[in-house]
Amino acid sequence: MKKTIRILLSLACVAALVLSLGVGALAKSDIDLEEVAAMAQKACDQQEIQNIMSWHVMYHCYGLHREEMEEIWVNEPENRATASFGQNQGFYVGYDSIWEAYVEGHDTSWLATAKNYCAQSDIDIEGWTDEEILEVYGGVGQLLLHVTTTAIIEVAEDGQTAKCFWYSPGMIAESGQTGNTIWEAYGVDFVKEDGEWKMWHLHMFTDFMGGFYLTLGGKTSGGMGGPGGGGGASGEASGDSSEQQEWKGEGGAQASSKHDYLYSPQYKEFSHDRLRSDMEIFLPKAYDEWSFDDGNYGPTREEYESFGIDLDAWYDAH
């Protein structure tokens, strides 16, 4: 079915090109049909990648992290070993590490939120198992919506990887706490496995956040909302000003000793003097080969032919 959809999309792109160029133009000898087909394939790839990113947004919004990891993240062992989920304070590296934080940590966060909601609403759940509570009340009273905008999708010339950028104005809220708006930059790498695009590296860097009813000069409640799951669910409400709060991972999840967590100290405190993280942003452009040396996400402007990097050596060096 998916293959059929891809073929239909490619044919639709070719049809659009035919209409734009004109049938007469295609009949001329100077029209390279292989080039036209390549253009159509790239357009198809870009649309599929956009759809996958949108699925990530909705999976996260509905708390379906397990389904997300199983459906749209990488499957091949080599790619799973080098998969990463990054935020301002560091990176989870490896599929198992991401799973522990993004799936298991999320379930823990949602359970705490569900119990809190039931307590506030005088709902009797005495004798219920954790699984029953999650099934009925998981996600109730919680909002996690990271809308993606300004898509920049660069597919490699070999059609096997892609570097992408989105900006996200988002909203996070939890029952009993003040909601926050959150402004983030997403840098995402995709890789094609058996003809299907899969999410490989997901890096999300927060520029700033503020309460729904407060100015940036006011106070915020809770932490950010990411791998650990709750949008501030595990972040403690604080009377301190946002400048004094130390930012934690989404849901406040802590890395397990079983997995590697690459700590990056570039963003420890919020500062009104600089409403950006200390991470310099590089936007995806046409590029030559996949490289980590261009920053934590985003390439330089070069022609891009293939991925071409020893990931093990890069991780050892960093």
Where are these regions (language model features)?
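A solvent-exposed, acidic/Ser-Thr-rich amphipathic alpha-helical stretch
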Residues: 66-167
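Ser/Thr/Gly/Pro-rich low-complexity, disordered linker/stalk segments of secreted
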Residues: 224-242
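Bacterial N-terminal signal peptides that target proteins for export
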Residues: 1-12
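Intrinsically disordered, low-complexity Ser/Thr/Pro-rich tracts
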Residues: 5, 19-31
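Intrinsic low-complexity, glycine/proline- and repeat-rich
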Residues: 251-318
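Bacterial N-terminal signal peptides
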Residues: 11-20
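Short, low-complexity N-terminal intrinsically disordered segments enriched in polar/charged residues
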Residues: 26-67, 71-75, 227
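Short beta-strand edge/turn micro-motifs at domain boundaries
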Residues: 161-165, 183-216
